[in-house]
Amino acid sequence: MSPSDVPINWKRNLTVTWLGCFLTGAAFSLVMPFLPLYVEQLGVTGHSALNMWSGLVFSITFLFSAIASPFWGGLADRKGRKIMLLRSALGMAIVMLLMGMAQNIWQFLILRALLGLLGGFIPNANALIATQVPRHKSGWALGTLSTGGVSGALLGPLAGGLLADHYGLRPVFFITASVLFICFLLTFFFIRENFLPVSKKEMLHVREVVASLKNPRLVLSLFVTTLIIQVATGSIAPILTLYVRELAGDVSNIAFISGMIASVPGVAALLSAPRLGKLGDRIGPEKILIVALIISVLLLIPMSFVQTPWQLALLRFLLGAADGALLPAVQTLLVYNSTNQIAGRIFSYNQSFRDIGNVTGPLMGAAISASYGFRAVFCVTAGVVLFNAIYSWNSLRRRRLAIE
């Protein structure tokens, strides 16, 4: 029996990739709480300069990830997804190690860009599982996998803050590098993939990739949906703490309250994603997608009228439960509308749109709040999500009419 004929235990692969996504999500978010403090430690002084450099080192990772993702996706379709997981985990571990040794802000900025270039563990994990899991279980599997990165991202800031308080800023980068190296070892020893490498000549070009899609217009609308989900999430991030302070008034534990309100959507998504993914397998991911978008609009609008932090926390928890269904539903629809031959590139294109949303969302939120106040951000974000709901519904309706 040849290696390519050996049956794959996709459930074991799902467990290991979930753990890998958890460690990657935790590793990325470990350093987030003190990023501005590390920028300051590297010699940046002055309020405006500190804000500018903090914004740059945060956003440049997503920008370079958006640029690099299609290249890595193409390579994954040629060489296999496991090797891309190994490349990503080891590359990020080395870069994190070097970040802990940075001597000035320019070195740190270049390393943050390099982190974006070498990243891509989670989209490649999605592509691997999407090509191995039975189609009728795609929603549940991708929903479950999404909880790995979410739970890692939730625990990461807490662990990072505690580690930084006890050991200092630089050691946290070394700890993060160790976490990513563990991710590399888990992938190397436990993930199995039957993949026959494809020669460069046999690879489909971009036009052929588009032509091979069952519904190119629908796939493009799914990419746009991913972008808008991230824009909607990111637009609130820059103003959340300030908005909570405005609602709470003069309280001593504002950091704790803000942190809790920031984290509740992730907790809700963690609970809802596998269940709604399973429901999507039963009734169709397109229905889950449209309903979740509409619910998001209905929850965003009242956020601009809340009077207490606890009202905001409740609405954000419900929003997180709806959001937990969105990206898995998009990914499941991408699986349904593409072939295994191009899965790496399709998921990498989706990641590029996600990264662009991660860059533009905070910029949009900051600009709106500066001009019209905090409450306007929620109304504008609701409008953007409503546009996306109508656009997605129209694209899915066209697809249904074409099938009929």
Swiss-Prot record:
CDD domains: MFS_MdtG_MDR_like. Keywords: Cell inner membrane, Cell membrane, Membrane, Transmembrane, Transmembrane helix, Transport. One of its GO terms (cellular component) is plasma membrane. The keyword ATP-binding does not apply. SUPFAM superfamilies: MFS general substrate transporter. It is found in: Cell inner membrane. The keyword Transferase does not apply. It holds the Pfam family Sugar_tr. GO terms for molecular function: transmembrane transporter activity. It is a multi-pass membrane protein. InterPro entries: MFS, MFS_dom, MFS_MdtG_subfamily, MFS_sugar_transport-like, MFS_trans_sf, Mutidrug-R_MdtG, Tet-R_TetA/multi-R_MdtG-like. Belongs to the major facilitator superfamily. DHA1 family. MdtG (TC 2.A.1.2.20) subfamily. This is Multidrug resistance protein MdtG. It comes from Salmonella typhimurium (strain LT2 / SGSC1412 / ATCC 700720). The gene is mdtG.
